[in-house]
Amino acid sequence: MGIEEKAGNLGIVTTTLETVVNWGRTNAMWPLLFGLACCAIEMMGAQASNYDLSRFGMELNRASPRQADLMIVAGRVSRKMAPVVRRLYDQMPEPKWVIAMGDCAACGGIFNNYAIVQGVDEVVPVDVYVAGCPPRPEALIDGIMMLHQKVMREKISGKKESPIRIDQPLVQVK
């Protein structure tokens, strides 16, 4: 009879510190919204009452990067805007995550010219890519759910996994 069985008989729940910390991180993510183009409209739609991102622990959007732990880059990033994105990312406390929302944020989209960064991952490390032009709110919610799963697998030591790419939304609307 192991300690887990004895603890279970006494009504004691056993878990690891990593599980508890990661559960807290997933249920209290505070996003810094960085809407740069048409994807920002869909990002706002995801926070409306139809989809309600507060179900996922995102009650408030943060205007200050010092209070945020998730940056959602929605839209194309110009070369002039890239240092601002990097500065905001650097001001965020650890642990921090980035979602690239839309084709423009992921790979430059249809704007293949000198003025547009061909993917925000040239500026900041991206954890989840959400495809679409613009992606629907369901796709952003899928990306957030995938990020939650990724955070639950992380070690407290801070070693991060490789990025997740979402090509098709997991949630289907009828």
Swiss-Prot record:
Its cofactor is [4Fe-4S] cluster. It is a peripheral membrane protein. One of its GO terms (cellular component) is respiratory chain complex I. One of its GO terms (biological process) is electron transport coupled proton transport. Binds 1 [4Fe-4S] cluster. [4Fe-4S] cluster binds at C38, C39, C104, C133. It is found in: Cell membrane. It catalyses: a quinone + NADH + 5 H(+)(in) = a quinol + NAD(+) + 4 H(+)(out). GO terms for molecular function: 4 iron, 4 sulfur cluster binding; iron ion binding; NADH dehydrogenase (ubiquinone) activity; NADH:ubiquinone reductase (non-electrogenic) activity; quinone binding. Its EC number is 7.1.1.-. SUPFAM superfamilies: HydA/Nqo6-like. Its main location: membrane. It holds the Pfam family Oxidored_q6. It comes from the Bacteria. InterPro entries: NADH_UbQ_OxRdtase-like_20kDa, NADH_UQ_OxRdtase_20Kd_su. Keywords: 4Fe-4S, Cell membrane, Iron, Iron-sulfur, Membrane, Metal-binding, NAD, Quinone, Translocase, Transport, Ubiquinone. Belongs to the complex I 20 kDa subunit family. NDH-1 is composed of 14 different subunits. Subunits NuoB, C, D, E, F, and G constitute the peripheral sector of the complex. NDH-1 shuttles electrons from NADH, via FMN and iron-sulfur (Fe-S) centers, to quinones in the respiratory chain. The immediate electron acceptor for the enzyme in this species is believed to be ubiquinone. Couples the redox reaction to proton translocation (for every two electrons transferred, four hydrogen ions are translocated across the cytoplasmic membrane), and thus conserves the redox energy in a proton gradient. PANTHER family: NADH DEHYDROGENASE, NADH DEHYDROGENASE [UBIQUINONE] IRON-SULFUR PROTEIN 7, MITOCHONDRIAL. This is NADH-quinone oxidoreductase subunit B 2. It comes from Chloroflexus aurantiacus (strain ATCC 29366 / DSM 635 / J-10-fl). The gene is nuoB2.
